[in-house]
Amino acid sequence: MSSADPTATKRDVRLAWAIHALTASGVLLGAGGLEAVVRGHPRTAIVYLIAAMVVDGIDGPIARAACVMDTLPGMDGNILDLVVDYLTCVMLPVAFMAYFHIFPPGWTVILCAAILFTAVLWFARTELMTEDNWFRGFPAIWNLVAPTFFLLRSPQWVNIVVTIALCVLTLTEVKFVHPMQVKHRRVVNIVVTSLWLIAMLVQTLLWPKDSLPLQIVLVAAPAWFAFITIERTRRGAPAPAA
């Protein structure tokens, strides 16, 4: 184990612990979301999912900027992040899809088991990302998939097909973008991700009323990421920096 940065001050140590606490707070949001699911409150559950996504999106850049790994080498932020992500990105969305009938009764157990199984294998990969910071395989972001299914009221057969495809892609070498870390089109990807989350939140607050503009965003955002996934995978070589 590497030693702590000898130049780190008490303030640096406190900041590092605070950032780890921010990451760990995702389990509290996940627990709140699970309670909402069990109580039959889909809107509340989605709000918890979105809050967890926001935390997951900001803790990494903050940790890297604060050099947390150097300050607290005895705490592995990557492992902490993976543990939290499996709860908020996989287990909570699976519970959501099971409780709120995203799939037909005969398919629910099979597909939920497939999601849990393929996702845990993905999290165990030793090389999760390419040299230019694209994910290898579908990165188990079911926290985006499940609310999108629900808010779009997509037909159950569509949900089945998409879920099977994503489970298969989880264990492949298909390249999926990390909006924050991939330099190529970073601004566009962050904007699209932000619009997706905003549309998801507003449509959730409006539910059960549907908004056509918001529904369009909920379709267009994943369509954009599907396009750049195909583009990057077909190219093979690392994407240009800009």
PLM regions and their residue ranges:
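Membrane-anchoring/interfacial helices and their immediately flanking loops
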Residues: 118-141
